[in-house]
């Protein structure tokens, strides 16, 4: 179920304040965050946000196409190594 339009998009306050400070000083630093649930706002464009995937912080460079999506969509939590090759000799 999608979020109600009357509520508006969600972003954590600490993340928004960090980005606002960087925009005021026009600095480009990597911002570390654990907030995968935050929506990407237009103010985030051009910044690199390190999103936690449960193991490490994955750097995500925010572009215009990402606005409206969640930060967690760009930092996968599971590593897929593929299925094993067909082992025909054990199957009869």
From Swiss-Prot:
SUPFAM superfamilies with a match to the protein in the record: Ribosomal protein S19
InterPro entries membership: Ribosomal_uS19, Ribosomal_uS19_bac-type, Ribosomal_uS19_CS, Ribosomal_uS19_SF
Signal peptide: none
GO biological-process terms attached to the record: ribosomal small subunit assembly; translation
GO MF terms held by the record: rRNA binding; structural constituent of ribosome
Gene3D superfamilies: 30s Ribosomal Protein S19, Chain A
Superkingdom of the source species: Bacteria
Gene Ontology cellular component list: cytoplasm; small ribosomal subunit
Swiss-Prot/TrEMBL keywords: Ribonucleoprotein, Ribosomal protein, RNA-binding, rRNA-binding
Role noted for this protein: Protein S19 forms a complex with S13 that binds strongly to the 16S ribosomal RNA.
Family: Belongs to the universal ribosomal protein uS19 family.
Name this polypeptide is given: Small ribosomal subunit protein uS19
Native organism: Bacillus anthracis
Lineage, uppermost ranks: Bacteria, Bacillati, Bacillota, Bacilli, Bacillales
Gene name, Swiss-Prot/TrEMBL: rpsS
